[in-house]
Amino acid sequence: MKLNRYLDHTLLKPEATEQQIDQVVREALENHFYSVMVNPYWVKHVHAQLAGSDVATACVIGFPLGANTTAIKVAEAKQAIADGVDELDMVINIGELKGDHYDAVQQDIESVVTVGHTADKVVKVIIETALLTDGEIVKASEIVADAHADFVKTSTGFSTRGASVHDISLMKGAVQDRIGVKASGGIHTRDEALAMIDAGATRLGVSASMAIIGK
């Protein structure tokens, strides 16, 4: 297993400086991580350094609350694509999910998926498992698959907890092999990373990438 190719090397802290972003980019290039995941402001800067490499440029959309209007999420996605992004990790409208307004949740996702897929970009969808019941995790995962996104993702890393093996098992059970499953938030060691993969995760969002690969 090439564990490094499971990793989205992530720096989403609001106080992240250009110097810190550049360090993450260097680490990703040296270790061939799957992508560098940043906030939208940094996409153009990161893409300029990663273009032509085997490391993708990724960013978050509607982050971290997911409570933006769909139009704003779409505009943010379009800007990121113009700036050179390869993968978009959007946050669902969590309140609408918990309010059982499933059509609204799916339409919000589909709008970003359409923009992403039209430009041949990967779209991952964060459901924020920390705020959901088991039943809501399953339902949200099904909605994400029905919206034709590429991955369902556990967490922003900004809520009450990150991913758990239980979350991943529920999500994988819901989507089977229809779409990928991404675990993110609170994964700090190789053993934790492998446990997520064993449970069904096909991508990991981590800031502790260097520790996970033993560097």
From Swiss-Prot:
Pathway terms, separated by semicolons: Carbohydrate degradation; 2-deoxy-D-ribose 1-phosphate degradation; D-glyceraldehyde 3-phosphate and acetaldehyde from 2-deoxy-alpha-D-ribose 1-phosphate: step 2/2
UniProt EC number: 4.1.2.4
One cellular-component annotation, GO: cytoplasm
Location of the active site: 89 (proton donor/acceptor), 153 (schiff-base intermediate with acetaldehyde), 182 (proton donor/acceptor)
GO function terms (MF aspect): deoxyribose-phosphate aldolase activity
Localization annotation: Cytoplasm
Superkingdom assignment: Bacteria
Reactions listed under catalytic activity: 2-deoxy-D-ribose 5-phosphate = D-glyceraldehyde 3-phosphate + acetaldehyde
GO biological process: 2-deoxyribose 1-phosphate catabolic process; carbohydrate catabolic process; deoxyribonucleotide catabolic process
Gene3D superfamilies named in the record: Aldolase class I
Keywords: Cytoplasm, Lyase, Schiff base
InterPro entries linked to this entry: Aldolase_TIM, DeoC, DeoC/FbaB/LacD_aldolase, DeoC_typeI
Signal peptide from the UniProt entry: none
Enzyme class, first EC level, given as a word: lyase
Role this protein plays: Catalyzes a reversible aldol reaction between acetaldehyde and D-glyceraldehyde 3-phosphate to generate 2-deoxy-D-ribose 5-phosphate.
Protein family according to the UniProt entry: Belongs to the DeoC/FbaB aldolase family. DeoC type 1 subfamily.
Alphabetical list of HAMAP family matching this protein: DeoC_type1 (MF_00114)
Name of this protein: Deoxyribose-phosphate aldolase
Biological source species: Lactiplantibacillus plantarum (strain ATCC BAA-793 / NCIMB 8826 / WCFS1) (Lactobacillus plantarum)
The encoding gene: deoC
